[in-house]
Amino acid sequence: MRALAVLLLLSAAHPAVAQGFDTVISGGTIYDGTGAPGFRGWVALNGDRVAAVGSGEAPKAARTIDATGKAVAPGFINMLSWATESLMVDGRAMSDIKQGVTLEVLGEGWSMGPYTAEMKTVLARQQQDFRYAIDWTTLGQYLAKLEKAGISPNVASFVGATTVRIHEIGAGDVDPTPAQLQSMAKLVREAMNEGAMGVGSSLIYAPASYAETPELVVLANASAGCGGSYISHMRSEGAGIEAAVDELVRIARESGGPAEMYHMKLSGKDNWGKLPAVLKKVADARAEGLDIRGNMYVYPAGATGLDASMPTWVQAGGIDAWVARLKDPATRAKVIAEMRGKPVGWENLAQSAGDPSKVMFIGFRNEKLRPLIGKTLAEVMALRGTSAEDTIIDLVIEDGSRVDTVYFLMSDENVKATASLPWVTLGSDAEASAPEGLFLKSSTHPRAYGNVARFLGKYVRDEKVDTLEGAVRRLSGLPAERLKLADRGFLKPGMAADVVVFDPATIADRATFEKPQQYAVGVSHVWVNGVQVLADGTHTGAKPGRFVKGPGFGKCPA
């Protein structure tokens, strides 16, 4: 009787119930993204929308998908994606679609606009395996270009604090004048008006590290005034992490907007015990009424470059100036001395890893160096007969790049503890990849292929850090609320038809650090805007993804 009442209610609101839907997903356990317990039922799709959700007998449809024994959830949101370039060359986003990701959120400190003519020239020269014309200027133009070209997932972006800084004052270690800072804030507002989600920073890297807190407050205030949030790779995730959290909280307090920590982690064994202090600072800020959250990838290693193992002053002005300084014997000697000492005002991730065997190279620009992909710093030191510091410096010079590098930095215990926090969402901090073509020229971090699946399999199912309904909320409804998305993140009538069907009993990551380019398993079906992009685990080739606009779109005056 209850099922009949539900169906009749939905029929009144949605006439298509009586007439038949485009697609009905039936027999699965529905997790609607709110954190409510799942229930056995059906989800109906019409066009690009969820038309109805109910229990009991499923209504008629042009196509019915049997989801018996599986979970049906809103499409997952990747809160930290580096699919900026990978989507330019392969819009399928295979590694993420196969995990149920339907929205890639870009913009960790660096964004694909706004650019000056000089920035375009430099970026074109620095392109590696992925080559494309930079025929846009603003961030909104880039995102619109992706949609027009065809992409399988939806895409959104924060505007990069680093990007607007370079736009106005270059890559040097200088402070903006008041007029330049106002121009930077204007660029943030313009990006918000185009649809950016907020402003993002990445403060351990040059030239982002040159920005002082008041500068970041001004940019965060510009974002908050347009409804956006501030999101940050904080100034330290190691010895200085408590001060870094204090800075994030200060920026939230003074800007009046929400703030979020990228890839919440504690780097270096000496810092692993600081997690309780960090969580207390967040709890105190939240009790004060500040909206502080975080996101993470569920691995004990991070991936970045060798720039994160050198003092930031030597990197001022960009890669060409950096390499030129390293070639100067006196400067090189000074850099080596600082790399061997205790870092002051910067993070040395090679030092934090604790041993050269815990630093692995995964990507080079120089073809001659590519045989070193997959080798550790210790192995390359042995091959060359050089010290850790000399090896790092030589590789940067020879490659003319920061060199893509994995650092084993975190404890499994802290990863598990952080993965249990109800205010922490998931972000891969990686490209959307495929084990084919250009992607095979380099390696990657396994998080590119397994972050969501590892969370749902290893951590939720096996280690029970959260309920399944709580985990789905943190992959869908919670990030959608943070981004102020009015029509995504939940399985409710009228919402965008971004849907994933997966098997909670079998979902798992297969990618490892030794063999990272392996797809996850357990996701059978994915829809993006009502179009099926994954059917029985196979990509359909469809590219219905859209540029998802942020809260200031069209209403944020510059």
Regions found by a protein language model. Name each.
Residues H14-A18:
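Sec/Tat signal peptide C-region and signal peptidase I cleavage site
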Residues I30-W42, V403-L409, N414-V415, E463-R473, ...:
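Acidic, glycine-enriched loop/beta-strand segments at the rims
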Residues A67-T137:
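Metal-associated gating/positioning segment near the N- to mid-region
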Residues G28, D328, A417-W423, D429, ...:
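C-terminal cap of metal-dependent C-N hydrolases
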Residues Y142-L146, I151-P178, Q182-Y205, L216, ...:
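Active-site neighborhoods of metal-dependent hydrolases
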Residues A3-A13:
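Bacterial N-terminal signal peptides
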Residues E190, A196-E247:
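Divalent metal-binding pocket/active-site signature
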Residues G20-T23, I30, T34-G75, D90, ...:
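Histidine-rich, glycine-flanked metal-binding segment
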